Amino acid sequence: MAAETATSKQNLVILGGSYAGLSTAHYLLRHVVPQLPGKESYQVILISASSEAMCRPACPRALISDDMFQQDKLFVSIPAQFEQYLKDTFKFIHGTVTSLDHQDRCVTVSVKDGDPEKIKCHAIVIATGASTASPLLGLNRDSETLRTNWNEFRAALPTAKHIVIAGGGPAGVETAGELGEYLNGRAGWFHSKLENPKVEITLVTADSKILPILRPALATKAEKLLNKVGVTVIKKSRVTNVTPPGAGAEDALTANATVTLEDGKELQADLYIPATGMTYNSSFVDASLLTDYGRVETDPGTLRVVNGGALLYAIGDVGSHARPAVHNILNTVPILCANMKRDLLLAVQPDASVGEDRQFKEDTRETQLVPVGRSKGVGAFMGFRQPGFMVWLIKGRDYWLWTTEGLWSGKHWAKGS
């Protein structure tokens, strides 16, 4: 049975230690807690299954070799990012949330290398994100596990002759492009495709085109770029079976696989990478608070959890308020924190003059940047098509690593908004 942690503090508890969780913690510590009456009574607690944060968008390239990125920038210690704050204002717990009681506002945590803890919360922010189908493409558990998976994949890569990737979204396209260029090189200027690639790489999508969020012309260009690094794209064909079961998952990461498509065609794979969709990390949340897809049902304007009671919020991929994307996370952090500040003030002074809620409105214009290999890519930003050079400059050169130092350290949130 979990022991309840005794504390005299009002705990503002954030569940999740990636873009949404760290950003929310920094914003609260910089711009919310200092403006609350009795500010000394509040403590921000961040709970994460990993003690390190990492630039998850970089996984399609990072999985190939440690030489692709400076490792001390790709992975950073979470506790180290918060040493700048007074000790009694912040606490980091390395563990996994196993249950959330939204009525009593408490969470139970399976602590890494420790006994389970039950924490009484004054406010809760659910920022646990989502897990990828492939254990190569995200922090599904912790950084140590991800590194172990990468090492196993890298050991199998030199002997692979056939690689199958399922999923035509950015993760699948980027992974195919990175592996294609690394293993096969790129076709010359006057060749539309790479003939006789060293490794046959096949990308399978159930959609009529890859990159469904982008306009058809950009999807077509991306497919041509994939062809130039030896990737064959199969469209309108869903993967219906993989043998052995679990191939590409953690327990059979590098197993040889037979991939069966819905038309009965079979593909033989020395390596199989499932890059289809995500599983939202919400198993600890009461089912009454979830959508049919497993996301936390979140008010699209205020970021409060629908039917969750007071002082319960969700942000990032796990929330239902917006399409999973880093730019949506960054746009919602100030709004969630402003509304939490309003709620915290009212909890102390019910008749306080706190103004109206701030409202988030998702920008649904075409926005997505997709590198295809080390120097090419396609994309659009706020509805405007971007040339390949801009895709490389903004994302493709290091997969956003140039932005993460400011986010992890909180410098990005130096000014409130």
From Swiss-Prot:
<dbReference type="Pfam" id="PF07992">
    <property type="entry name" value="Pyr_redox_2"/>
</dbReference>
<comment type="function">
    <text>Oxidoreductase; part of the gene cluster that mediates the biosynthesis of phenalenones such as herqueinone, compounds that have been reported to treat tumors, bacterial infections and/or mycoses, and rheumatic diseases. The non-reducing polyketide synthase phnA synthesizes the heptaketide backbone and cyclizes it into the angular, hemiketal-containing naphtho-gamma-pyrone prephenalenone. The product template (PT) domain of phnA catalyzes only the C4-C9 aldol condensation, which is unprecedented among known PT domains.</text>
</comment>
<dbReference type="InterPro" id="IPR023753">
    <property type="entry name" value="FAD/NAD-binding_dom"/>
</dbReference>
<keyword id="KW-0560">Oxidoreductase</keyword>
<dbReference type="GO" id="GO:0005737">
    <property type="term" value="C:cytoplasm"/>
</dbReference>
<dbReference type="InterPro" id="IPR036188">
    <property type="entry name" value="FAD/NAD-bd_sf"/>
</dbReference>
<keyword id="KW-0285">Flavoprotein</keyword>
<dbReference type="GO" id="GO:0050660">
    <property type="term" value="F:flavin adenine dinucleotide binding"/>
</dbReference>
<keyword id="KW-0274">FAD</keyword>
<dbReference type="GO" id="GO:0004174">
    <property type="term" value="F:electron-transferring-flavoprotein dehydrogenase activity"/>
</dbReference>
<feature type="binding site">
    <location>
        <position position="317"/>
    </location>
    <ligand>
        <name>6-hydroxy-FAD</name>
    </ligand>
</feature>
<comment type="pathway">
    <text>Secondary metabolite biosynthesis.</text>
</comment>
<protein>
    <recommendedName>
        <fullName>Oxidoreductase phnG</fullName>
        <ecNumber>1.-.-.-</ecNumber>
    </recommendedName>
</protein>
<feature type="binding site">
    <location>
        <position position="61"/>
    </location>
    <ligand>
        <name>6-hydroxy-FAD</name>
    </ligand>
</feature>
<feature type="binding site">
    <location>
        <begin position="16"/>
        <end position="20"/>
    </location>
    <ligand>
        <name>6-hydroxy-FAD</name>
    </ligand>
</feature>
<comment type="similarity">
    <text>Belongs to the FAD-dependent oxidoreductase family.</text>
</comment>
